[in-house]
A protein has these predicted regions:
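Conserved catalytic network of the ASCE P-loop NTPase/AAA+ motor domain
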Residues: 18-21, 46-50, 94-98, 130-136, ...
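Substrate-engagement module of ASCE P-loop NTPases
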Residues: 114-115, 120-147
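Conserved inter-motif catalytic segment of the P-loop NTP-binding fold
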Residues: 49-113
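Phosphate-binding/switch region of NTP-binding enzymes
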Residues: 137, 143-197
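Glycine-rich P-loop/Walker A and Walker A-like loops and their local beta1-loop-alpha1 context
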Residues: 5-61
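Short, charged/polar "capping" segments at the starts of alpha-helices
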Residues: 36, 61-67, 148-151
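Nucleotide/phosphate-binding sheet-loop regions of phosphoryl- and nucleotidyl-transfer enzymes
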Residues: 200-347
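Structural recognition of the conserved hydrophobic beta-strand(s) that form the central parallel beta-sheet
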Residues: 28, 56, 104-106, 136-145
Length: 347
């Protein structure tokens, strides 16, 4: 029978947090993935000593955060298949493993390039974290600093049990607990400097202020990155159109936008790249509510219209009714399910 208390693998960090608890989801907000890896390895090694089953969800483009020579089961997933297949696959694996397994996830920021929107990362965490909690697991996650909207970070922080900011200042590591569920101490929520095997609280207000001010200035310098990835992508597309860049560069952007707006089926994407212009895709986005795919029937209608208009022998533009459709993005549908607490019925 395992104890409810779990070690991080760092005695000093255990002292700060009063250890981890069974059910904890631990989110690390980091500057660099190698800093996350530094804290993952001792956690994994100690869990193996305690004969825990550990599953590593591998889906990022960054180097693995768990060494291949450790006795850990690696489950490789492709987030480009979409939110639903990705979230359902993790749900199914966790269900099959049952109670008591431990999990390490690649950096969640990697999902941005696949899903194009912060909002769905928060949705993913909101459906995954509570389920792992009920299965008596301990799970490690990471987010890269300055890559996500404030609202996304807030939703993840609200959902998780433990949220830790990790600062690396010229190789010196500082851990700043922002949330530790159902635990408290007089110094728990101060920044702590790693010193040997210990973590020393920055009780000196000047030191703490300098550390946090440095992090704040980085946040301010990255102001444009506070925009959701989806909106940044379309701002880039609008900029390309306004500048009148070469056709090849516009075609590259069209292909990129199609993967986030039109769908994933190769035959449909091939037609979309052929018949849709950058102007077309930007006009469709302007008629969207939310983010995600506009839907198969809508894509079929738009493609059929463009194919007809491309015919040289008929003035279809004079015959067709004016286009007046609006679109509800697929992410609105998923968000409706998640926010109403119906995901497990759906999954």
């Amino acid at each position: 029978m395992h104890d409810r208390r779990v070690t991080t693998g760092f005695r000093g960090l255990d002292d700060i947090l009063d250890g981890l608890r069974i059910g904890d989801n631990v989110v690390w907000k980091v500057d660099d993935i190698k800093d996350y890896r530094y804290f993952v390895e001792p956690f994994v090694k100690q869990a193996l000593v305690e004969r825990r089953e550990i599953i590593y969800f591998r889906f990022g483009q960054h180097p693995p955060v768990v060494r291949a020579d450790l006795d850990v089961e690696t489950c490789e997933l492709d987030p480009r298949e979409g939110f639903e297949p990705f979230a359902c696959a993790i749900h199914a694996i966790a269900t099959a493993k049952g109670v008591g397994a431990f999990y390490v996830f690649d950096c969640l920021s990697e999902l941005l390039s696949a899903w194009a929107t912060d909002h769905m990362i928060a949705n993913f965490f909101q459906v995954t974290c509570p389920y792992l909690f009920r299965l008596d697991t301990v799970a490690y996650f990471a987010l890269l600093r300055n890559r996500h909207a404030h609202k996304t970070i807030a939703r993840i922080r609200e959902t998780t049990q433990v949220f830790l900011e990790l600062h690396n200042r010229d190789g010196e590591l500082f851990v700043h607990p922002l949330k530790v569920w159902e635990r408290h101490s007089p110094t728990m929520f101060l920044p702590h400097r790693e010193s040997g095997e210990s973590f020393i609280p920055l009780a000196n207000s000047l030191e703490a202020t300098n550390l946090l001010a440095g992090a704040y200035s980085q946040d301010q310098a990255a102001g444009s990155r506070r925009l959701d990835h989806w909106h940044r992508l379309f701002l880039q597309a609008e900029d390309l159109k306004a500048k009148g860049v070469a056709a090849a560069e516009q075609e590259k952007m069209v292909a990129h936008l199609c993967r986030h707006l039109i769908g994933r089926e190769d035959n449909i994407l091939s037609l979309a790249r052929r018949f849709f212009s950058l102007h077309d895709l930007l006009s469709y986005k302007a008629r969207m509510i939310g983010t995600g795919f506009i839907g198969g029937k809508a894509v079929g209608m738009l493609l059929a219209r463009r194919i007809l208009e491309a015919q040289p022998d008929t003035e279809w533009r004079d015959l067709l009714e004016q286009h007046d459709s609006f679109f509800v993005g697929s992410n609105v549908y998923y968000s409706y399910i998640v926010n109403n607490g119906w995901w497990e019925l759906y999954a």
